[in-house]
Regions:
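A conserved pocket-lining segment of Rossmann-fold NAD(P)-dependent short-chain dehydrogenase/reductase
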Residues: 88, 140-144, 169-182, 193-216, ...
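C-terminal substrate-binding subdomain of Rossmann-fold SDR/epimerase-dehydratase oxidoreductases
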Residues: 15-19, 58-59, 197-333
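A glycine/serine/threonine-rich, flexible loop-to-helix segment
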Residues: 133, 186-194
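N-terminal Rossmann-like NAD(P)+-binding domain of SDR-like oxidoreductases, especially those catalyzing
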Residues: 1-179, 311-314, 325-332
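Conserved active-site region of classical short-chain dehydrogenase/reductase
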Residues: 100-108, 187, 219-222, 226
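Hydrophobic alpha-helix immediately C-terminal to the catalytic Tyr-X-X-X-Lys motif of short-chain
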Residues: 155, 159, 163, 193, ...
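Short alpha-helical
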Residues: 11, 83, 132, 184, ...
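Short, solvent-exposed loop/helix junctions and linker helices
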Residues: 6, 89, 97-100, 149, ...
Length: 333
């Protein structure tokens, strides 16, 4: 099968690419496209640029202009997206451009080139905040996004629906929970907190730290996506989860304990506007395909910390601008 992986040097996309290159060379003829518009994507590119796959440096907005050398793709797997909620708050247009118009361009490319299969990597945030302790969103629930980021991803899901009904493209949508693991962009909560700990800075938490997230190791996400590709039904949506929930205080303490620190190293900062209280998804539909998460949280967190510590010099070279951009994070309560 000829596959095109978009956003192949982003966080989840790169973990997916690595797995395909290591374990699925006999199943997939792999091509990738990425704009390389940030330093960590360039680092990931350098790690695999000698591997056996075709890479195209371009933004998905310009995919119609790329010469793919008559590849005749069977499937596009779309990881390309702007994904940081904080950035979406002060620059929503960036997310409309990438996450909505970019997806439309990819689907139009499918129509023009007779590509029958499309995998859209969405997010659990499209459901909005869970309002009760026992509320878990299922795939058929109404979308209620809160941030410009989640609204852009929900919009992309709707565009996928339209292309499926209008043009007959076989589309599967995947909505993972909050991911963590190696190669994650340093502005995200876990790597950002690890960076602060390494630099003897306080771990900064929005509001009172009571917000709850559903944590999913990226390697479990990759195996879930592969399961949907192989066994999922066209036109369906699949949540990916782990059943592991922590509020931000609990998560911060788990990180600090790994460095023999305690809650005195936590600093509470002004809350994010429109901050969802809880994300929670039911993933029985994916389990029915024969998938289950296999990574235990503490061990996966240790692997994540190890990767961030080993790459701390490079991460620190690129994180200072991120610190400056995250204006809300540094406004004390």
């Amino acid at each position: 099968m000829n596959i095109l992986i978009t956003g192949c040097f982003g966080f989840i996309g790169f973990n997916f690419l690595q797995t395909c290159l290591e374990d699925y060379q006999d199943d997939f003829n792999i091509s990738g496209i990425d704009s390389l518009n940030n330093p960590y994507s360039k680092l990931n590119h350098n790690l695999v640029k000698e591997r056996n796959f075709e890479f195209y440096k371009e933004d998905i907005k310009n995919i119609m202009n790329v010469d793919f050398k008559n590849k005749n793709f069977d499937m596009i797997i779309n990881f390309a997206a702007e994904s940081h909620v904080d950035t979406s708050i002060y620059n929503p247009a960036l997310f409309i451009d990438s996450n909505i118009l970019g997806v439309n361009n990819l689907l139009n490319f499918c129509v023009k080139n007779n590509i029958d299969n499309f995998i859209q990597i969405s997010t659990d945030e499209v459901y909005g905040s869970a309002s009760k302790d026992n509320e878990f969103f299922v795939e058929s629930d109404i979308l209620n996004p809160s941030s410009p980021y989640s609204a852009s991803k929900a919009s992309a899901d709707m565009i996928c629906n339209a292309y499926e009904k209008t043009y007959g493209i076989n589309i599967k949508k995947i909505r993972p929970a909050n991911n963590y693991g190696p190669f994650q962009q340093p502005e995200k909560l876990i790597p950002f907190s690890i960076s602060n700990i390494i630099k003897n800075n306080e771990v900064e938490i929005y509001g009172d730290g009571s917000n709850i997230r559903h944590w999913l190791y990226v390697k479990d996400t990759v195996s879930g996506i592969l399961k949907v590709i192989e066994y999922g039904k066209s036109g369906e949506i699949y949540n990916i989860g782990s059943g592991i929930y922590f509020n931000n205080n609990e998560l911060a303490l788990k990180l600090l304990e790994k460095f023999n620190l305690d809650s005195s190293s936590i600093k509470y900062v002004k809350d994010r506007p429109g901050h969802d209280f809880k994300y929670a998804v039911n993933f029985d539909k994916l389990k029915a395909l024969g998938w289950n998460p296999k990574y235990e949280f503490d061990l996966a967190l240790e692997e994540t910390i190890k990767w961030n510590v080993e790459n701390s010099k490079w991460l620190e070279e690129n994180i200072e601008q991120i610190r400056k951009n995250r204006k809300l994070r540094f406004e004390s309560k």
